Amino acid sequence: MTTDQHQEILRTEGLSKFFPGVKALDNVDFSLRRGEIMALLGENGAGKSTLIKALTGVYHADRGTIWLEGQAISPKNTAHAQQLGIGTVYQEVNLLPNMSVADNLFIGREPKRFGLLRRKEMEKRATELMASYGFSLDVREPLNRFSVAMQQIVAICRAIDLSAKVLILDEPTASLDTQEVELLFDLMRQLRDRGVSLIFVTHFLDQVYQVSDRITVLRNGSFVGCRETCELPQIELVKMMLGRELDTHALQRAGRTLLSDKPVAAFKNYGKKGTIAPFDLEVRPGEIVGLAGLLGSGRTETAEVIFGIKPADSGTALIKGKPQNLRSPHQASVLGIGFCPEDRKTDGIIAAASVRENIILALQAQRGWLRPISRKEQQEIAERFIRQLGIRTPSTEQPIEFLSGGNQQKVLLSRWLLTRPQFLILDEPTRGIDVGAHAEIIRLIETLCADGLALLVISSELEELVGYADRVIIMRDRKQVAEIPLAELSVPAIMNAIAA
């Protein structure tokens, strides 16, 4: 970067945003230079999305100031932010796919004469705009005929043509292949060289080191630090994101005696293009396999492919030794696979339904709605699991939304245990629950394992994984990159593998 490019264009001072019981942003100082690519990183709940929404007028900060080119600004909405010079392009392009490229580039500001659209002039200007960044395409074609990468490039060109001085790219590479990523990076570098400042939000660390000039890390709503990319080793970056220091302590514990050498579930070269790279995985009765990695590394996608939410398009799956085609969650459930998702409020519980109704849901779906479970049987089932798992609720008819996070998690576990699975996937089972419930869930996981259940546990709590997993698989950039056996298992070993 030149000396001029080191000039600050955007700055926040003490920016804070509060929601009931949550500090989404806490006194954040953020700085962006003219003509640089700034990577904005952080785990789930770090505050990245809140910061972006504050900068673009979606949220109004409760405290603090936003400065753009030395002037204090207060964006009222995204349109106002765009007028001020701050544009945003999201992973899901917010354009009109059935309209032409030219229409999308100039929608709302079409060239007109006497109230009539001057289409040829618009198409000429659109062609020239795309060509100015090295892209030759027929701007008369509908946007949806082009790749996702090209649609994003069109969205970026539109934002820049609207006089964006600062461009925020929120997970732009999440659904792109390698060639498409490089195409996007070429455009980002062109924009940087022309003096545009970019904020690049991503979870792909390799891409951060490919394209960014500096890195800002947020954690738990607070500013952790900003470093020059070329001066920040990846292991240091991971420490900043996770908030942990590497030490040499490794927990020594005996391995479990597996009930059988034959895997309950075995996946060979199993994957889905654009979702998760082909992977190999075997899980045996009475074994806990951990899945570790940063947010966006592919942990949840692995679970969704296994459970048939996003059916695989490559490889083979053997369930209890027999080849199976896992095309849906219902099919996976029938074959003895259960899945407790990470976001229990969105993907797990039915908030307004009772504890009883939430518990019997998976079993009823497995049986089919032509074989309804009687109300008496439902009541007996619910009472049994409330007793066995220690679910704290006034009654089986209490709406689950009024239960604590830990008790909601126990209800979800009850739902799947009722189907008598042989292989259970738990995605962040202890997230968002209090300390007491946290310990109870971990004890329950170990009890299920002792009873012969095969478990795949996704967790960001590395100490937890080290405490109960028999081995841990490391994910990075939607690929399996390492496996750590019990004898070598420690928090530093996991962190080093994540950052390698």
Swiss-Prot record:
Presence of keyword Lipoprotein:
no
Entry keyword Transferase: no
**Binding-site positions, ATP:** 42-49
Top EC category: translocase
Q: Which CDD domains match?
A: ABC_Carb_Monos_I, ABC_Carb_Monos_II
Matching entries from SMART domains are given as: AAA (SM00382)
Q: Where in the cell is it found?
A: Cell inner membrane
Which keywords annotate this record? ATP-binding, Cell inner membrane, Cell membrane, Membrane, Nucleotide-binding, Repeat, Sugar transport, Translocase, Transport
Residues in domain ABC transporter?
Answer: 10-245, 259-497
Q: How does it sit in the membrane?
A: Peripheral membrane protein
Under the heading InterPro entries, the entry gives: AAA+_ATPase, ABC_carbohydrate_import_ATPase, ABC_transporter-like_ATP-bd, ABC_transporter-like_CS, P-loop_NTPase, YtfR-like
**Catalyzed reaction equations:** D-galactofuranose(out) + ATP + H2O = D-galactofuranose(in) + ADP + phosphate + H(+)
The domain of life is: Bacteria
**Main subcellular localization, coarse class?**
membrane
Q: Which family does it belong to?
A: Belongs to the ABC transporter superfamily.
Protein name (record): Galactofuranose transporter ATP-binding protein YtfR
Top-level taxonomy: Bacteria, Pseudomonadati, Pseudomonadota, Gammaproteobacteria, Enterobacterales
